[in-house]
Amino acid sequence: MTEFPVRISQAYGVKGGWAAGYHTGVDLAVRVGTPVRSVGPGAVVAAGWAGDYGKAVTVRMEDGMYLLFAHLSEVYVREGAAVRAGTWLGRSGNTGHSTGPHLHFEVREQRGYGSDIDPVRYLADHGVRLG
């Protein structure tokens, strides 16, 4: 199992003022400019400004899941680009509706909002542990 030594500053599922009534991803406490990379192979289905998410990238993974990387300061990929594990997607930031620098990471079963699953469990199932 690969371990990434990052602190989770906001866990998945916490009740709050988000549109879904709970936090639909995890927030990772990283500094502005931290490299953000794909966790596996897939295709970029969205890249650029995404409203409250600020600058964001969504990757449809080969397993059919959609991974959202949000509040980026910079985006380095374009819609339609093929990615693999380690492809540089952009840099973390504080764009959109954000209270401070972090990476918001979300896993969805469908492309649209409201089909989220626990991203920590998804990563663990794919050999990655946060913390």
What are these regions (language model features)?
Residues 13, 33, 62-64, 110, ...:
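Solvent-exposed coil/turn segments that connect beta secondary-structure elements
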Residues 21-23, 39-76, 101:
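Zn2+-dependent peptidoglycan hydrolase active-site motif and core
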Residues 9, 29, 60, 70-73, ...:
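Residue-level detector of conserved, well-ordered beta-strand and adjacent loop positions
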Residues 1-53, 131:
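Surface-exposed, glycine-biased beta-strand/turn segments
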Residues 11, 47-48, 75, 92-95:
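Residue-level recognition of beta-strand microenvironments
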Residues 35-45, 77-92:
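Short, well-structured beta-strand-loop connectors
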Residues 7-9, 27, 58, 68, ...:
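Soluble periplasmic/extracytoplasmic beta-strand elements of cell-envelope proteins
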Residues 60, 81-131:
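Conserved, short, structured surface segments that act as functional micro-motifs
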